Amino acid sequence: MTISKSLALSIFLSLNLLANTNSTAQNTNSKISKKEQVKSSLASYEKYIDDNNDTHLKEFIQLVSIPSISSIPSNKPDVAKAADWIVNKLKAIGMTTAQSIPTDGNPVVYGSWDKAPGKPTVLIYAHYDVQPVKESEWENPPFVPKVIDGKIFGRGASDDKSGVMISIWAVEAMLSKEGKLPLNVKFLFEGEEEIGSPNFKNFLIKNKELLHTDFAVTADDAQYTESVPAITLSSRGAALLEFNVKTANTDAHSGQFGGKTPNAVVAMSQIISSLYDKAGNVAVKGFYDKVLPITAQQKEIIKNIPYDPARDMKILGTTAEVGDTAFSPLERVWYRPTLEIIGMQGGYTAAEGHSNIVPGSAMARITSRLVNNQNGQEIIDLIVKHINKYCPAGATVTYKFKPGYASPMTTPSDTKEFNYVADALLKVYNKQPLKLGTGGTGGAMLSFKEILGVYA
């Protein structure tokens, strides 16, 4: 197994290009000399990656082995352990500063190298927290990473500990071979991205001076394929909600009480069914009211994507698509909002046995993906109003509101920074990078623009 050399080399080249954004015009000979120097450096960095592959693999397995699940309180010590591991790695590669900074939730890892006076500063963002796991659905334990056919299987190996480590290894290679970087670099690794970054905005506000930067890039996005580079320009926001339906103080015996006692699971099913129309569109009144039309630029981005919806259906094993067919599949995933039931629980659900009960309570969790011009609190209010309206007789609903709402984000593609990164990807992959949207959420991205004044 080898790390993504192409991505690492793209980081090398991007840093070199960004380092010269403020340079005055150079003569032709100077430009040629600089170009040859960068080419030589890239070859040197590539050799460094090859020579250190075994070490990097061991390091990566160590980090992925830490169950840094941010949504489960009992895993908080593991999240802190992962943060400390990254801090020690940053110190080992020679960063000027490396520390774990506390927040009201999980710590943020900060590292900097500031020995390039007069040169710009770039801030590289990623996150080290991961999603929870359902271990019964894993062929191998999710926190015992295993290499299969050249790929590492483990929770967080892709999202987003690879982003953390490839960024670090790229800087490590440059410091090892050159003893310096072409510009000043700051690392910012979050520990709460998977729960909507509830404390990240306040962290940026409190540390605005420390985090001052000329550019910001995120290492939390994917390439289109292993051989086709891409730059992600938009992400959806997210709002979360948990609600409980209660029909009785306890589960009841179906032989004694069935037929006259309200069933909480049935009531929950009725509520959930009311959230959608027959085509799968969200039926909550006002849900789509503030959604902006898809722009000509967004349509052009999708037009250039070699996307095959049948491939996704085959991978997932689905037999039909849902949603408004007036929009293409990618338009629905990137530029339209969603309301998903991400989990339900109620009644007797043990793996074996059969308990003859009338369930007295049920629970469901919702994630709503938001698009530009939608507000998370407004959407949650609309959903709550709808649930209250359609809650059947004999049932009551209580709510557990999740902290914070991640806003949608769009990054412009007409900036010099975008052009430098695109040029680096073109040189490394020998292919023009695709412009992508993502249906996922990067809660930190909008805060970068609002507080630090830079796009990421």
What kind of region is each of these model predictions?
Residues A248, S254-R311:
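Polar, glycine-rich mid-to-C-terminal structural blocks
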